[in-house]
A protein has these predicted regions:
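Residues within alpha-helical transmembrane segments of multi-pass membrane proteins, especially transporters
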Residues: 5-7
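Mature extracellular/passenger domains of Gram-negative fimbrial/pilin and adhesin proteins
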Residues: 14-188
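Sec-dependent signal peptide recognition
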Residues: 1-3
Length: 188
């Protein structure tokens, strides 16, 4: 009986299974966007902006409509459009992290590299395409940033992301700052 059981076990096949995650993007085919960081790295569609480390003493004020905050980091969004596109309108949103003042709240629910989240710190995004900084208000569909394309099918938005106090009357504590936003560009 033992010999029969060993024969049956040795004849059995072992199996392992797993999961493969696939990610992609389907665009309407009219405009392709790129996120360009300060190093000139360009990523189609999605991207990341890494701000320099700020000291607590650097983050002195709450958001201001026409003044970026501490350690402002440049980035751009380029749009390469086909056809007779005349203008672009950009809005930004963040279902999870938009603050009432139009900035992005820090994600305090994660630990990064063993570091807890900084408190009382938000990220402000200012559109500097025209030369004058203007706050991009998260989750405000009426705050469209218009870019007119002059005889070309390409356009570039220029931005600065910076640290600001979430509440000007509260102290900032150290830690990581992590957040995200979605951008939408409509065109005509």
């Amino acid at each position: 009986l033992l010999a029969a059981a060993l024969v049956m076990v040795s004849g059995s096949a072992l199996a392992i299974d797993g999961q493969i995650d696939f990610y992609g993007r389907v665009a309407p085919g009219t405009c392709e966007t790129h996120i360009v960081n300060k190093n000139g790295s360009s990523i189609i569609g999605d991207g990341e902006v890494r701000l320099q480390t700020a000291q607590i003493a650097d983050i002195t004020s709450a958001v201001q409509a026409q003044t970026p905050g501490a350690k402002a980091e440049d980035f751009a969004i380029t749009a390469d459009c086909q056809g007779a596109i005349k203008s672009l309108a950009l809005t930004m949103s963040s279902p999870a992290y938009a603050a009432n003042d139009g900035t992005l709240k820090n994600n305090t629910n994660v630990t990064v590299g063993g570091s807890a989240a900084a408190t009382n710190v938000n990220i402000a995004v200012h559109d500097v395409t025209s030369g004058t900084p203007n706050l991009v208000k998260m989750n405000d569909a009426s705050d469209a940033h218009i870019l007119t394309l002059s005889g070309t099918s390409e356009g570039t938005y220029y931005f600065k992301a910076s640290y600001v106090r979430a509440d000007g009357s509260q102290d900032v504590t150290d830690g990581h700052v992590t957040t995200n936003a979605l951008y939408t560009i409509t065109y005509e």
